[in-house]
Amino acid sequence: HERYLFEQIKEAYYAKDRQTQMLLIPLLIGLSTKEMNIVRENIDMFENAGFILEEFGDNTYKVSGVSNVGYNIDHKSMFKDMITELSTTEKTERQEKEHRFLATLACKAAVKGGMKLDVEEQKRLVDNMIGLDNPFTCPHGRPTAIPMTRYEIERKFMRK
């Protein structure tokens, strides 16, 4: 799911097709001076990803809209994680910085282990993955599937 979301987010980001979900109650997120500067320096990345932000006092951002990806997301935590990712890529080339920023957004919005999906959601997830150019790794490089031989499968199900 993370890989599929990443490809969708990346396509919308570079097409400047902002996918924003307005929040009924805006988030007020307190930040350190360093974090405030990171957001200021990268405000275009947040906006292109669908966030609607404005400074709200000395060390606070008001978030009125968020990237419209995933569900059951803690937007405050996601926002802070994206700032943390940007803080580790300060001297990185713009394209790599954007890749890591979008990968973090996809990671935070993706279905996680232990989440329950109904049959339709499971089918849609598999169909979406099959249609990708690179369905075999998440944007961070971790595998999305593990190949197994017939023998390994039979052994797991105690047939051998």
Q: Which residue ranges define each predicted feature?
A:
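Long, charged low-complexity intrinsically disordered regions
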Residues: 1-160
